[in-house]
Amino acid sequence: MKFLYDLFPVILFFIVYKLFGIYEATAAAIAATIAQIAWAKITTGKVDNALIMSGVIIVVFGGATLWLQDESFIKWKPTILYWVFTVGLLGSQWLFKRNLIRGLMEKQITMPDPIWSRLNLAWAIFFLLLGFLNLYVAYNYSTDLWVDFKLFGTMGLMFVFVIGQTLLLNKHITEQDKK
């Protein structure tokens, strides 16, 4: 259910784009993200940092899209978000000696430190490349195709990446983790 909740603004963007256009879809994505932030605050009393970051980026880039009537800003939004994730993953590990991926997953699985470092690096590289791929699609194909890619392409790539990571990490997961 959380997966659909997290994808709500993207799915809404896709639907509204197909029905009305890029500017209406951008406004819907901004509203949906603000609603998500408000809902999280009301129901749990706290808002996840990634959601806050996504909210700031969609308001800034989506707002620029609407204000300037230039769709290139909204096309940059996923790339900026992915690159913020990249910087966060690498910066936290290299500057603060804190592995964010480990922090998210260590309650579920136990692995040696070097494996956690490689996993963190793999995610950082994945987000970096996904950002470049988003720009490539945005500027070399139609907006229609970019919108399709934004939902289905990135979700598909994420799914394949997670499956690949799971297969690679499986040999490092202890028997206790499998219980």
Swiss-Prot record:
Q: Name one GO cellular component term.
A: plasma membrane
Q: Which Pfam families match?
A: IspA (PF04279)
Q: What does this protein do?
A: Plays a role in cell envelope biogenesis, maintenance of cell envelope integrity and membrane homeostasis.
For this chain, the family text in UniProt reads: Belongs to the YciB family.
Q: Which gene encodes it?
A: yciB
Designated name of the protein = Inner membrane-spanning protein YciB
> How does the record classify its membrane topology?
Multi-pass membrane protein
Which residues span the membrane?
Answer: 3-23, 49-69, 76-96, 119-139, 149-169
Predominant subcellular localization, coarse grouping: membrane
Species name: Methylobacillus flagellatus (strain ATCC 51484 / DSM 6875 / VKM B-1610 / KT)
Subcellular locations according to the entry? Cell inner membrane
| UniProt keyword terms in alphabetical order | Cell inner membrane, Cell membrane, Membrane, Transmembrane, Transmembrane helix
Q: What PANTHER family does UniProt report for this protein, alphabetically?
A: INNER MEMBRANE-SPANNING PROTEIN YCIB, INTRACELLULAR SEPTATION PROTEIN A-RELATED
